Amino acid sequence: MKNRIVLFLILLLIFSCDSNKNIPVDLKTEYSINPLGIDTDLPRFSWKLPQNSNVKRQLFYQVLVADKIINLKENKSLVWDSGKIKSDKNFTVFDGNELLPNTRYFWIVKIWDNNGNESSYSIHSSFQTGIKETWSAKWITDKEDINEKRAPYFKKEFKTHSTIKEATVYIASAGLHNFKLNGNNVGDEFMNPIYTRFDKRILYNTYDVTELIKKNNIIDIVLGNGWINHQSIAVWDFHKAHWRSRPRFIFEMVINYKDGRQEKIISDKSWKTSFGRIQFNSIYTAEHVDNNKENKSWKQVIEVPIPTDKISSQQLPPVRKVKAYPAVSFVKLSDNTYLYDFGQNMSGVTELKIDGPKGTIVRVKHGEQLKDGRLDNSGIEVHYRPKDDKDPFQTDIYTLNGNGQEIFSPIFNYKGFRYAEV
């Protein structure tokens, strides 16, 4: 009798282990892991079976969605229960109660296999809905026109009043934006948002800034021309685009406190604007930075009309810096000129660490090929139509302030290059 009990327990244990091997993994919403800014009312869910699974075929699945993890565990107050669905497909489309904007949801899934075995529920995944059509903020910019070459800087100070549960930022820009909160870069993306036709649609980015919020806070935003204001002229005629304007943006921070209160920090006339280090930026050519220029004479912003009626969440992989390549060699061309070889052609930017006397001007010219030992951009420069020599092609220009080591790297431009002539 004891042997039978032991055998029965062993069989139960084996069954339990097999069941645990079959728990779905790699849960994604709209093809992303725990995404923010989901705009669609019908998000798509997908999952996989683990590599060590003994399941040959999934026969059924069940998905649960809730706005609290505890509700998933207790199977109550669900936003959606798919029920037991007969299907061998590892994806489904949400079909539950209306999803609220700026709300985090959690979901789990379990499956039944071809042997009739039921898995345990997966570890929960999450997604957060976007702001949709509920913007309270205003579009703002400075008072300059499309001919102003200096980049506009913006700031806003605010205080929090209690313990924060979570804080989410939504920001859209006609042009490119670089966003800092309390001196910290927000997000690891580069040159956001992705290009669209600005008269048809503009994309907004979503950031979880909960960990960056303090009692006293300052928001810093600088805008780049991007595709909204082409000041460099080329054969593609983007400088003639009918949507051309001074860069502008809209910003909304939603702060949820643990005591249940909600507060919004929005872009409006209370923000201030100034000029700073970036003296010129062009997505075609380069960026010019003067470290002697500081943000002074902060002025009031102006509110401007919305550039388009359609503002959508950016739900595609952004541009990111993915790898650093040190120079593999360099040669001295003259007393003040050096040529660096990075070993392969790439789309990217250079980062320059340098110290020198105040007012020293450093030019970093990028290119893909050499001719007689010097950088040769003739193959691509034929498309460029400069008015003067102040905006040389693929050449960043930096002016030193003389205060020790300085670091330069463009934030609103990238190059195609293997070589850099400094």
Model-derived segments and their meaning:
Residues 2-8:
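Sec-dependent signal peptide recognition
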